[in-house]
Amino acid sequence: IFHQAGCDWTMPSRPGWDNSDMCMFTGDYEMMGRIKRAHFELAQKLRVKRIVMGECGHAFRSVYDQGNRWLGWKDSPVPVVHAIEFYWELINEGKIKITHQYEDPVTIHDPCNTVRGRGLADKLRDVVHFLCANVVEMTPNREHNFCCSAGGGIINCGPPFKSVRMEGNRVKADQLRNTGVHTVVAPCHNCHGGLEDIIKHHKLGMHTKFIGDLIYELMEK
């Protein structure tokens, strides 16, 4: 996608390239600050103009919200954007063109860290409607959408909590089932894991996709 859009980009090869941050889940804010410092220091050494975060909600929040504050920074030393924002820019600037739209009906899951936390509901929908011909909204949606069952790092607590997550979030299973679609667009890694667990446990016959999956599948190459 980066190459097709003609972006000038790089991927670090040293520590600091990955923003997965278990410290945010465990409450180890001192270590979280160290991880963020390494990330931004590496970005500054590379002299990049901004950091594009992948489709991961917790990593994004640990950068744009919590890591900065625990380091005592008012703003990030290097601007940070989520993949939703970046894809939106590429599409609106005409840098990504698609050969056709995705025809099967899809629904949109709103990740908490990008929609409630960052306010990206409109841009998320702009991107999905550009890519997909038939979008069916969940009810409720946007900032009122139901949790994926993986939030706050609970999915990483493993098997002992899985049955609680599955049975305790039947409301999400019902919400998904009521859309009548088979494809869920979820731009967050944790949400993918949580939704896939719900889909399998409740036998919903659905599958999940990242926005990047759809763009690569549909774009001119």
Regions found by a protein language model. Give the residues of each.
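Iron-sulfur cluster-binding electron-transfer modules in prokaryotic oxidoreductases
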Residues: 1-221
